[in-house]
């Protein structure tokens, strides 16, 4: 009987602690703007493409951030951002060395993450993890191509918008995680203002290429994003 009473008292104390902590949280909602730079590389099989080399390129990342604090150390965060995910392909087969293509892909990204925070009242660290959905809005390419005669190889520059076709998977999804740092530079009774720095890694789990009729050719984009933000909590 005494053990049951002790268990009951422990549960009551735990519940009271959570309620008391929540009651002391003045600002549950956080809204903000963010912007920065990212680097994207493509994960693709080299089967049948031994003369192709892929390398990452940079792109812009800017958008909105919304967060709801469940406790002092846990929040649910959702971002809505426009992101350019770019990479480069080079041909390295002797006389084709000058040939290359830059791929620039504009995406709308919607990550949903758990935000685990730690630290003091003003300076706090954040560990983020979750998933995201994305929509491929536009695709652009530029580079140098070639054409041949019996005796010569000619090179031409090209640049333009690429039209989507049935092989493109425009809706994609994946896992996202990273670290963040925030500093509250203004604290008022009804509002806090803070600046933030986030490093997030987006890992595609859905190929943006559906493949051909008799050939599977999955292509996944992986992006490291660094952004600065301005946040308002209320």
Say what each PLM segment does.
Residues 1-29, 34, 228-234:
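Bacterial Sec-dependent N-terminal signal peptides
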Residues 23-65:
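Short glycine/proline- and aromatic-enriched beta-strand/turn motifs that initiate or cap beta-hairpins
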Residues 23-28, 73, 119-124, 185-193:
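Short loop/turn motifs that connect adjacent beta-strands in outer-membrane beta-barrel proteins
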Residues 29, 60, 74, 108, ...:
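Hydrophobic core residues within well-ordered beta-strands of beta-rich domains
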Residues 33-37, 60-68, 80-82, 110-116, ...:
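Residues on the lipid-exposed face of transmembrane beta-strands in outer-membrane beta-barrel proteins
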Residues 41-57, 84-107, 134-172, 204-225:
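Extracellular/periplasm-exposed beta-strand and loop segments of Gram-negative cell-envelope proteins
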Residues 101-107, 114-117, 123:
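Helix-adjacent hinge/juxtasegments
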Residues 168-173, 182, 187, 192-198, ...:
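Outer membrane beta-barrel transmembrane domains
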């Amino acid at each position: 009987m005494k053990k049951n009473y002790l268990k009951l008292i422990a549960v009551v104390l735990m519940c009271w602690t959570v309620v008391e902590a929540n009651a002391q949280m003045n600002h549950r909602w956080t809204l903000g703007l963010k912007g920065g730079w990212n680097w994207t590389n493509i994960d693709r099989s080299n089967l049948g493409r031994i003369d192709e080399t892929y390398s990452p390129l940079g792109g812009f990342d800017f958008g909105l951030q919304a967060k709801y604090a469940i406790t002092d150390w846990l929040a649910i965060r959702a971002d809505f951002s426009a992101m350019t995910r770019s990479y480069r392909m080079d041909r390295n087969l002797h006389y084709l060395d000058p040939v290359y293509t830059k791929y620039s892909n504009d995406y709308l990204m919607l990550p949903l993450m758990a935000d685990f925070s730690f630290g003091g009242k003003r300076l706090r660290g954040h560990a983020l993890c979750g998933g995201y959905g994305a929509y491929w809005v536009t695709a652009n390419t530029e580079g140098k191509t070639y054409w041949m005669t019996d005796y010569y190889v000619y090179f031409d520059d090209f640049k333009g918008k690429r039209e989507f076709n049935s092989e493109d998977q425009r809706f994609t999804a994946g896992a996202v995680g990273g670290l963040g740092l925030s500093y509250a530079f203004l604290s008022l009774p009804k509002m806090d203002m803070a600046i933030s720095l986030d490093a997030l890694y987006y890992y595609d789990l859905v190929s943006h290429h559906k493949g051909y009729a008799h050939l599977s050719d999955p292509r996944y984009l992986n992006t490291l994003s660094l952004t600065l933000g301005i946040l308002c909590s209320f």
